[in-house]
Amino acid sequence: MAKTEQRFDYVKIGLASPERIIEWGQRTLPNGQVVGEVTKPETINYRTLKPEMDGLFCERIFGPVKDWECHCGKYKRVRHRGIVCERCGVEVTESRVRRHRMGYIKLAAPVTHVWYLKGIPSHIATLLDMPLRDVEQVVYFNAYVVVDPGNAPNLSYKQLLTEDQYLEIEDQMYEEGSELQLPENWAMIGAEAIERLLKDIDLEKEAEQLREEIASARGQKRARLIKRLRVIDNFIATGARPEWMVLRVLPVIPPDLRPMVQLDGGRFATSDLNDLYRRVINRNNRLARLQEIMAPEIIVRNEKRMLQEAVDALIDNGRRGRMVVGANNRPLKSLSDIIEGKQGRFRQNLLGKRVDYSGRSVIVVGPNLRMHQCGLPKEMAIELFQPFVIHKLIKRGIVNNIKAAKKLIQSNDPQVWDVLEDVIDGHPVLLNRAPTLHRLGIQAFEPILVEGRAIQLHPLVCPAFNADFDGDQMAVHVPLSLEAQAEARLLMLATNNILSPATGAPIITPSQDMVLGCYYLTADNPHAPDLGDRYFASLEDALIAYDRGVIGLHSKIWVRYSGPMELGKEEKESEPQIIEEPGGTRLKITNYRRIREDRDGNVISQYIRTTAGRIIFNKTVQDILSA
């Protein structure tokens, strides 16, 4: 298979001309035979289990089923590469060409593309400036549309006519002495009529006329004109023609993308697309045969409508009319179903691919972590960082080759954990929690090896991830290159993302357990024992007493303290009780402070009334501020 070396920036989905669709699937064999058109609804021969020629799995059109082997078996082996078998016409090549070689079906009558007819808004209806209901009446053979009114006074361009009205005007035209002159196809029905109307549109002229009308239009009419002009401008910009929204050639996707596989019991499982394509081919062939034998118009018209419905079901089953169902009344999966939605080709396979060097696990709280750290399970870390560990093991001379290194890792050798510690030191990892609704949904952390199988997350970063610990899962990704690691450290580290990019307000705010913990530490418990006679020489002494169980967390105690403190409203407003002591000193007593001063008013000592919990809280804050 030829690989393209051409780089591209994006994939654009647009309208394809009938010539382009034929070009996708048509090939000329060395003997001059042109292949590519699928004409038979058969898939495989149930006796030989080989694809039928010119069918939906034809080897001549799509390539051989087996590598380097033609259909009839005349040529086998790679040495016949590129030869086209003169007996069966199959090119001897790799079977994987069946993943990209396309075919096509030439339709016996044009059909509208259901996306452009029934999409919201309907581009065909917008472009023709007709109500969608009227366009549908024409497409599904319920009404005629006037495409050339001739000299008829009571007819106008794009006017809809019922069957009876159409026949009445036809009779008038052929009456003796009638002055009514109408061209042969003055009124048409079905997708042919829509194709004719679309062909008649001069895009440049129409765009110019619309711009003039928009200048003077107001309100609803102006909005409608702008919508129509936008569609026309897009057609002009892309170089597409409006009539391409009506299909004359239908592409057939490669057979390996709609496979047919044999099950154990000899039965076959097949993709729904094959059933939908088979319906189209059967109806198309029947229509071609009816046209050949000059069948009555009513029968031909009914077959054309059925062909239109079959193509609609193939492109987007259920978009219009009843859904086509298969066995067990299950709706068949159309081309649109394959590419749209969460399980579709784009979101599932192209945008959301699974990546190497990644893992996921349940998150649990890690209150002992620093904010820029996360707890990474050893089992996960050894798997994610395995190439780095192997490199380090060889570099240190612990092992000589990769195989020996892998064996050492599998045996859980203590040396491996030492090397792993060394490897992850300073190597950030990315944590992501789905859905990633803003950029803080993925942040970088320094990993700390932990036991168990859960990822430990600092509680402060939970609001950014919108995470909680009721079973949430998070994904881990390892940035490999030095550039990626530097970028993760400088831009994505949790400590660099304290403010919300949306509002500028802090997103790292204490909540839940942290607020409750701070409240519990500093709460004034009226039921706690009042140890008013307990005095401590320093904060450290009080903490030692708490650690030894001498005092409780909320026990009221007096502690000698000379540092800065903020007075509460009650303390500021209360008058101190002053006790004069022998030797000239005096004692000022309030509810929360006891201050001893010398005769000049200098503070000799100060005791404050507090609890062990408040001392712990204050010490923690002071330690962080002075760090």
UniProtKB/Swiss-Prot annotation:
Task: Report the top EC class in one word.
Answer: transferase
A single GO cellular-component term from the record reads: DNA-directed RNA polymerase complex
Question: Which superkingdom?
Answer: Bacteria
Q: Which cofactors does this gene product need?
A: Mg(2+); Zn(2+)
Question: Which InterPro entries does the record cross-reference, listed alphabetically?
Answer: DNA-dir_RpoC1_gamma, DNA-dir_RpoC_beta_prime, RNA_pol_asu, RNA_pol_N, RNA_pol_Rpb1_1, RNA_pol_Rpb1_3, RNA_pol_Rpb1_3_sf, RNA_pol_Rpb1_clamp_domain
Question: Which Pfam families does the UniProt record give?
Answer: RNA_pol_Rpb1_1, RNA_pol_Rpb1_2, RNA_pol_Rpb1_3
Q: Which residues bind Zn(2+)?
A: C70, C72, C85, C88
Give me the residues that bind Mg(2+), please: D468, D470, D472
Q: Which GO terms describe its molecular function?
A: DNA binding; DNA-directed RNA polymerase activity; magnesium ion binding; zinc ion binding
Q: Which reaction does it catalyse?
A: RNA(n) + a ribonucleoside 5'-triphosphate = RNA(n+1) + diphosphate
Per the entry, the cofactor note is: Binds 1 Mg(2+) ion per subunit.
As recorded in UniProt, its EC number(s) are 2.7.7.6
Listed A to Z, the keywords are: DNA-directed RNA polymerase, Magnesium, Metal-binding, Nucleotidyltransferase, Transcription, Transferase, Zinc
Per the UniProt entry, what are the Gene Ontology biological process annotations, in alphabetical order?
DNA-templated transcription
| Subunit text | In cyanobacteria the RNAP catalytic core is composed of 2 alpha, 1 beta, 1 beta', 1 gamma and 1 omega subunit. When a sigma factor is associated with the core the holoenzyme is formed, which can initiate transcription.
Q: What PANTHER family does the record tag this protein with? A: DNA-DIRECTED RNA POLYMERASE (PTHR19376), DNA-DIRECTED RNA POLYMERASE SUBUNIT BETA (PTHR19376:SF54)
What function is annotated for this protein?
A: DNA-dependent RNA polymerase catalyzes the transcription of DNA into RNA using the four ribonucleoside triphosphates as substrates.
Q: Which family does it belong to?
A: Belongs to the RNA polymerase beta' chain family. RpoC1 subfamily.
Q: This protein is called what? A: DNA-directed RNA polymerase subunit gamma
Native source organism of the sequence: Synechococcus sp. (strain JA-3-3Ab)
